[in-house]
Each structure stands twice: as C-alpha cells, then as structure tokens.
C-alpha cells in the first residue's frame, strides 16, 4: 500500500506541529505568562509557545464545534416549539498517568471561558468517582486504583447522564491526592455549565472494557468531543518517576499525606519504588485498559520530550 493510500484509509487527519499551529488563524492569546505558569502541572514546562501553537488552534476548533452544537439545539427547539433545557457540551480528556491530562484540561478550561461568548466551563476529574479506600481495601483492589473495577461507574454515568438531561444541578465527589482518597461529604455542585471538561483515565472506555459489570450506557456515550493525550512509553515512565521524586520533596512532606513515609527515602530508593509502582500498576493499566481506547478519540495529541506536542491527529 502506498503512503497516499494509507493516509486515505486512516480515520484521522494528521498534522505536525507547524501545520497545526497555522490553524490558530487570528485567535488572540488570552492568557498571560503568569496565568500559564499557574496552569501547568508539577512535572511540566508549559510555555506560552505551547499554548499558542497547540492549545489556541484546539480551542478554535472546539469553539466551532460548540457553536455548531448550539445551532443544532436551536433547530430542535424551533421544530418542537419549545424553549429547551440547557444542555452542556461535554469534552473528555483521557491518557496515561503522568502524561499531563490535568494541565491540558486546565488550559482548555481557561481558553474556552475567555472566548467572546464568555461560556461557563466546569472541570471535573473522574478520580472523585473512584470507590473510597475502605471499599477498595474490602475488595482487595488498593493495588488496582485506576483500573475499571476501582470506579463507581454507575455514579459516574448517572452524573454525566443527569447533566445531558438538563438537570439544574448535579453533584460530583472530589478526590484528594493528599489523603489518596475520596473526600467524605466533599461533593462539588455543578450547575448547568455551558461546557463540561471531564478528565480521567477511563473516559473513553465502553462496554468492551467492563465485561464484569454489564450496564448498558457509558461515559463515552454522552461525550461530544474526546481527546487522548499520548506519549511514548519510555517518556511516560520517566515523567512518572520524576513526578514521584518532586512529590517526595513537596506534597509527601506533609504529615497528613498518605505517602508521607516516602518523604525520607534516599533518592535511589525512591526511584526504585516509583519504578516498581509504574510497572506493577500504572504501566499495566495503560496497556490493558487505557491505550486500547486511544483510537476512539476525536483527537489524539502526541507528546515528545519536555511535554511538547509534536503530532496532532483529528478524526475526519
């Protein structure tokens, strides 16, 4: 098969960094360098160039899709002769642990809320929908946090279903990385946002990923646009270990941290533990449950060293 034929048979349009950056068109930069610094994760160098060349074109594309969706809703209301309920546009962001999903989500939230329409953008992570530690311990699943079995999928599906049904307000549980658990009675109220960004490991999964739990609808059924943040496996491992070491010098030093006992470890021992955690838990979850969902995404962003995106694939 020729290169031309292979490009024609893929469901994705492919853009290198320069090609994608050109699609920004004339969209203005609405974030200052100080604001960008606040949005980046502990393990990332998020530059103003990265926002301009990768995230501004993406926010422009999403604004087109969202506007089109609103026009479609208006057509339906005109046909029915009703003033319809406010239905949020849902964007999901999936990918491995340590790939930078949270930073992508925060940057998109900031950019989309600054478009002239001043849309209200909520950000929810699916970590809150993990079963509490007490339940995971009872079921012997503490070493499988993030695997399909560790989530309260019924509650997560009900959350997105209620939003898509026009509910006035819904609640989402909140996860604390400090205590490594869902916060008891710490639910967040979500009141009819224009856009919901849902970030998590499992947001592209479907019935094929839950043979043990045969329910009929999934988060992906309610998502309007899905993003998969991708990177080579060796970089993911490097970023995971590096993040662990930074936490060891920062968050883990808090006496209330679930991982406080790691704070005093010598660096070589900490690297060994981080590597073990990566291979035994996070790499397994990536290979078995996360990576197989990549080709379901509307858009795939592939990162290289320094967390810089160098390839974007957009579903035709």
Swiss-Prot record:
Catalytic function, reaction form: (R)-pantothenate + ATP = (R)-4'-phosphopantothenate + ADP + H(+)
Any one biological process term the GO annotation gives: coenzyme A biosynthetic process
Record-listed ATP binding positions: 95-102
Molecular-function annotations in GO: ATP binding; pantothenate kinase activity
Annotated EC: 2.7.1.33
Location of this chain's protein in the cell: Cytoplasm
Gene Ontology cellular component terms for the protein in this record: cytoplasm
PANTHER family in the record: URIDINE KINASE
Family: Belongs to the prokaryotic pantothenate kinase family.
Cited NCBIfam families: panK_bact
UniProt-recorded name of the protein: Pantothenate kinase
């Amino acid at each position: 098969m020729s290169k031309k034929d292979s490009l024609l048979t893929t469901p994705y349009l492919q853009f290198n960094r320069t090609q994608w950056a050109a699609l920004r068109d004339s969209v203005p930069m609405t974030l200052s360098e100080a604001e960008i610094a606040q949005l980046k994760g502990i393990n990332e160098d998020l530059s103003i160039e990265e926002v301009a060349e990768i995230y501004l074109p993406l926010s422009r594309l999403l604004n087109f899709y969202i506007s089109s969706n609103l026009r479609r809703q208006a057509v339906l209301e005109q046909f029915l002769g009703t003033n319809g309920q406010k239905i949020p546009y849902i964007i999901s962001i999936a990918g491995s642990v340590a790939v930078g999903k949270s930073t992508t989500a925060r940057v998109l939230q900031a950019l989309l809320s600054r478009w002239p329409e001043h849309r209200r953008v909520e950000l929810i992570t699916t970590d809150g929908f993990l079963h509490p530690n007490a339940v995971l311990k009872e079921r012997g699943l503490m070493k499988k946090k993030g695997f399909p079995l560790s989530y309260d999928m019924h509650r997560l599906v009900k959350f997105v279903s209620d939003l898509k049904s026009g509910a006035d307000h819904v609640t989402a549980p909140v996860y604390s990385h400090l205590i490594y658990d869902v916060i008891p009675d710490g639910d967040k109220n979500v009141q009819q946002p224009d856009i919901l960004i849902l970030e998590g490991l499992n947001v592209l999964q479907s019935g094929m990923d839950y043979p043990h739990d045969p329910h009929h609808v999934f988060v992906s059924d309610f998502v309007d646009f899905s993003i998969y943040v991708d990177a080579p496996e060796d970089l993911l491992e490097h970023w995971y270990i590096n993040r662990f070491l930074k936490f060891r010098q920062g968050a883990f030093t808090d006496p209330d941290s679930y991982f406080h006992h790691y704070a005093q470890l010598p660096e070589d021992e900490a690297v060994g533990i981080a590597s073990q955690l990566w291979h035994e838990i996070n790499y397994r979850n990536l290979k078995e449950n996360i990576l197989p969902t990549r080709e379901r995404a509307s858009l795939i962003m592939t990162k290289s060293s320094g967390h810089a995106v160098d390839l974007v694939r957009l579903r035709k």
